[in-house]
Design a protein with these regions (language model features):
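Conserved, compact domain cores that house catalytic/ligand-binding motifs in diverse enzymes
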Residues: 85-162, 168-169
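Multi-bladed beta-propeller domains
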Residues: 1, 26-42, 109-125, 154-172, ...
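Short, aromatic- and glycine-rich surface loops/edge beta-strands on solvent-exposed regions
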Residues: 49-64
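Conserved beta-propeller blade repeats
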Residues: 122-141, 166-188, 229-247, 257, ...
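Contiguous beta-strand segments within globular domains
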Residues: 1-13
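Short, conserved, GDST-rich strand-edge loop motifs in beta-rich repeat architectures
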Residues: 84-97, 187-209, 249-266, 311-325
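Asp-box/WD-like beta-propeller blade repeats and closely related beta-sheet repeat scaffolds
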Residues: 71-85, 93, 158-212, 223-236
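A short loop-to-beta-strand structural motif that recurs across blades of beta-propeller domains
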Residues: 102, 150-152, 212-214, 267-269, ...
Length: 341
């Protein structure tokens, strides 16, 4: 049920393109033109006819009045439908200046994109960190930075605009992750900075001067924390386990920043959480040590069945978006083994 996989042939001197997409069943799709825009109706009918099998794509191009056929390639058609949609932030690439940005919903069986929240609704605002409780539209959390900034929480029956910077807290709430019950939401609080390199392949470095992890209870409007998550170390990227009794996060030893930014490497850690009363365990467990890998872990995401945890691995730091060497890894939570994806 995925949307048509349109593509273009980018070779030089291409005058025409001929494409045939066919399976063992159903009516083949034949297209001509410089770009391949597959009609949605024909595409979905072909996929429906070949569920659990493969379709084959044959591409021919005309260059210099001669036709050349590329090697055909298969596309496997899953017997299961694709998820309904995705939600993401969309903005033009840049470092400091931005104009229009927002949080958008994309229907995966089509190319339909719907704005959920745009910064045109809030003057000169940066709309960024957002989270839903698993695959449900509510509850949700969106962070808005700027003169009219707030943490926006939709509990399903009310919409709240909150100043989440509590007394003595490093910042307002930043990276979010909902408790499966919807009764709590974990956040990191970060003093984040960016710097530009004078040379080299990485133009920019984003780093924390300090960071902690807290848990917010929307019903009582209380920030919950423990000294174990508010140390001199950098704690960030919280994520609850599917049963809601473990809080995963990343932690790195404090270094002089930005001088020693390459020495900051985050381990994957966890602490027990008791949803009955919103309290924490009395120790931190290290699941994967940065010292062992000599790498840095960021963005931990546990699977909903509780069997696995996916994370990003990079050379250093926690803002792996700017790191070309960053890659996804998968941790087996039962065996402790992890592998590159």
């Amino acid at each position: 049920t995925i949307a048509p996989l349109n593509f273009r042939v980018t070779d030089d001197g291409v005058e025409a393109v001929d494409v045939v997409i066919a399976g063992t069943k159903g009516k083949p799709v034949r297209l001509n033109g410089r770009s391949v825009d597959i009609p949605a109706k024909q595409w979905h009918e072909l996929l429906e006819s070949n569920k659990g099998d493969s379709i084959e794509v044959k591409v021919s191009v005309r260059q210099g009045k001669k036709w050349k056929e590329y090697r055909p390639f298969p596309i496997y058609v899953s017997p299961f439908p694709i998820d309904y949609g995705l939600v993401y932030r969309l903005l033009a690439p840049g470092y400091e200046v931005y104009s229009k940005m927002g949080i958008y919903e994309r229907e995966l069986s089509t190319f339909r994109q719907t704005p959920l929240f745009e910064n045109t609704q809030v003057t000169a605002a940066c709309i960024n960190c957002h989270a839903f409780n698993r695959t449900e539209p509510t509850p949700s959390s969106v962070h808005v930075r700027g003169g009219h900034g707030a943490t926006v929480i939709d509990t399903g029956d009310r919409l709240e605009f909150l100043d989440t910077k509590a007394d003595g807290q490093l910042s307002a709430c930043v990276y979010p992750y909902w408790h499966p019950s919807g009764e709590y939401i974990a956040y990191s609080v970060n003093k984040t900075n960016q710097a530009f390199h004078l040379g080299g392949k990485k133009p920019i470095e984003v780093f924390d001067q300090a960071s902690d992890v807290v848990v917010y209870h929307p019903r009582s409007h209380r920030i919950l924390t423990t000294p174990l998550l508010s140390t001199a170390s950098f704690e960030t990227f919280p994520a609850f386990s599917p049963d809601g009794r473990t809080l995963y996060f990343c932690s790195a030893e404090q270094k002089e920043m930005p001088v020693r930014y390459k020495d900051v490497k985050y381990s994957l850690c966890s602490i027990a959480f008791h949803p009955e009363d919103g309290t924490f365990g009395d120790r931190i467990d290290t699941l994967i040590s940065a010292r062992t890998l000599d790498k840095s872990i960021s963005f931990p995401k546990p699977s909903f069945d509780g069997k696995y945890l996916m994370f990003t691995l990079s050379d250093y730091g926690n803002f792996s978006i700017w790191h070309k060497e960053a890659d996804l890894w998968l941790l087996d939570l039962k065996t402790g083994a992890y592998r590159n994806l």
